[in-house]
């Protein structure tokens, strides 16, 4: 999930809201992994990447102007999709490759 912060909202609040709106899941806990600047020198935009823990299925709440497909993809398939160049979104690639590195580091 991704989205803009509402006025007065911090990164965690935005991440929780966007997770539920776009996937239908609620997280018991969100852990900030890191912040990235997608285009330094061009804009001061920051993107916060989070790990969700304790997921509970709820209901998806897409905004009317959003064209989003939300589906569960098995882990093995996700990494095949990366290898095949099917996932092109930079922030998604960073988050997924971080996840893979963590799994390798922890012997999984």
Each model region followed by its residue ranges:
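Helix N-cap/coil-helix junction residues
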Residues: 24-25, 87
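Nudix hydrolase/Nudix homology domain
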Residues: 1, 7, 32, 40, ...
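Active-site-adjacent beta-strand/loop module that shapes the phosphate/pyrophosphate-binding cleft
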Residues: 36-58, 71
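Short small-residue beta-strand/loop micro-motif enriched in glycine and branched aliphatics
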Residues: 58-61, 80
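Conserved Nudix-box catalytic region and its N-terminal flanking loop in Nudix hydrolases
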Residues: 1-17, 34, 60
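A short coil-to-beta-strand element that immediately follows conserved catalytic motifs
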Residues: 26-33
């Amino acid at each position: 999930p991704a989205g803009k912060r509402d006025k007065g909202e911090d990164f965690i609040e935005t991440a929780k809201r966007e997770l539920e709106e776009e996937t239908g899941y609620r997280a018991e806990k969100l852990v900030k992994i890191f912040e990235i600047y997608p285009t330094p020198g061009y804009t001061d935009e920051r993107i916060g990447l989070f790990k969700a823990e304790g997921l509970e299925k709820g209901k998806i709440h897409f905004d009317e102007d959003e064209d989003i497909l939300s589906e569960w993809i098995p882990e093995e398939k996700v990494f095949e999709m990366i290898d095949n160049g099917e996932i092109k979104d930079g922030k998604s690639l960073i988050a997924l490759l971080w996840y893979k590195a963590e799994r390798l580091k922890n012997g999984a």
